[in-house]
């Protein structure tokens, strides 16, 4: 047996132990463990624990001197603190957050949040690889450029759908020329922002070659990112434009960022217009159709319309010139090329619901509150009509049953 206090450990003044204590004490405290040693005390004839951290020992000594009882700390005083002080603060904070959420105007961050939530059910696997890119500044500038372009594109569609007279007036020509010039400038501005994303500026972790650091291209990562990216852009534009023109937005986004060979919305539209005639083609007709399509090598080197605005081939240049001459039966005048870099300093116009007060929209879906109320009232009206129809049908059935019963009795 040992006399006094028998220590079964290394002496306290050992320098390596102090270094170890300083490095790992915080980790062990988080796990609920302490560094120390067990020793035998002859006075109490029991094992006792001594901690290596002096700060803890000082605190314990202070507590022993004051004779603090833990039962008192868990009594009614703590209950009064939690019940009367902390709970009202949480309720007040929730109310203030709701009020702050209703204040201000709708921003692009609000639309991104709603779009991400709406896509989680259907496109969860693709969108998960895109969530880390949500707060990138290059993404915000690209989305604003896309919305800026789509606003003029939808304006052009509305002008084309208007009934046109045989003699187009001078005012209509000026309006069409103005919209087409703005649309062309917006497409060039969008192309610059899109090229930054393709080159991986500010997003090396999403680039297929890690911006030149990797020697092998990760095509799977590139495909997943851009597929989720196109879906996300379509959803954002649909929400911004009050959940209208979904088909037009899908087709235009597919046309901008895909070639004709890989444009899925265009193929769907062509199949709907043809009415399934391609399935009933003869072999000669099928060969003629396939002869018009480019070879695989050419299809791999083809550029999307957005990229071809900045880096067009000779054939694409000639095709774009021929398309721009005549729009809606009107010959457009050639105009001088503008410096697109000046668009950076120009304040973007308010597009769709962006910039409008938040209190006019549902914070979870960004739907206008008026449309939701109209939908509820229309639902109520439809339910009333259904009830009336059922009651009328019941009375008619009752009358018919009585008539048949009267006719069945003998006279």
From Swiss-Prot:
GO terms for molecular function: phosphatase binding; protein phosphatase inhibitor activity. Signal peptide: none annotated. Keywords: Protein phosphatase inhibitor. Inhibits phosphatase activity of protein phosphatase 1 (PP1) complexes. It comes from Rattus norvegicus (Rat). The gene is Ppp1r36. InterPro entries: Pro_pase_1_reg_su_36 (IPR026142). Interacts with PPP1CA. It comes from the Eukaryota. This is Protein phosphatase 1 regulatory subunit 36.
């Amino acid at each position: 047996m040992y006399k006094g206090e028998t220590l079964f450990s290394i002496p306290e003044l050992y320098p390596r132990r102090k270094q170890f204590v300083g490095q790992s004490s915080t980790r062990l405290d988080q796990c609920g463990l302490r560094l120390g040693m067990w020793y035998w005390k002859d006075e109490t004839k029991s094992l006792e624990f001594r901690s290596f951290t002096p700060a803890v020992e000082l605190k314990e000594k202070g507590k022993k001197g004051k004779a603090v009882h833990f039962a008192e700390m868990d009594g009614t005083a703590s209950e009064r603190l939690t019940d009367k002080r902390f709970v009202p603060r949480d309720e007040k904070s929730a109310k203030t957050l709701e009020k702050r959420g209703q204040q201000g105007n709708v921003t692009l961050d609000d639309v991104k949040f709603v779009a991400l939530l709406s896509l989680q059910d259907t496109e969860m696997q693709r969108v998960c690889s895109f969530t880390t890119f949500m707060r990138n500044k290059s993404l915000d500038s690209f989305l604003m450029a896309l919305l800026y372009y789509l606003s003029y594109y939808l304006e052009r569609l509305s002008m084309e759908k208007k009934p046109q007279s045989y003699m187009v007036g001078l005012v209509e020509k000026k309006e069409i020329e103005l919209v087409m010039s703005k649309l062309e400038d917006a497409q060039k501005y969008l192309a610059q922002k899109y090229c930054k994303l393709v080159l991986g500026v500010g997003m090396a972790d999403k680039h297929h070659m890690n911006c030149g650091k990797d020697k092998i291209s990760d095509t799977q990562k590139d495909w997943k990112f851009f597929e989720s990216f196109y879906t996300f852009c379509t959803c954002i534009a649909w929400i911004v434009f009050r959940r209208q023109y979904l088909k037009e937005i899908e087709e235009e986004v597919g046309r901008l960022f895909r070639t004709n060979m890989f444009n899925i919305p265009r193929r769907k539209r062509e199949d709907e217009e043809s009415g399934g005639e391609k399935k009933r083609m003869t072999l000669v007709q099928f060969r003629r159709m396939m002869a018009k399509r480019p070879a695989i090598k050419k299809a791999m080197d083809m550029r999307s319309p957005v990229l071809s605005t900045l880096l067009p081939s000779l054939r694409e240049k000639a095709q774009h010139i021929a398309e721009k001459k005549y729009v809606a039966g009107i010959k457009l005048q050639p105009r001088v090329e503008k410096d697109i870099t000046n668009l950076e300093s120009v304040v973007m116009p308010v597009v769709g619901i962006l910039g409008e007060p938040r209190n006019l929209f549902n914070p979870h879906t960004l739907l206008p509150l008026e449309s939701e109320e109209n939908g509820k009232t229309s639902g109520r009206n439809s339910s009333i009509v259904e009830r009336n129809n059922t009651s009328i049908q019941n009375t008619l059935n009752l009358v018919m049953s009585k008539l048949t019963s009267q006719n069945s009795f003998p006279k």
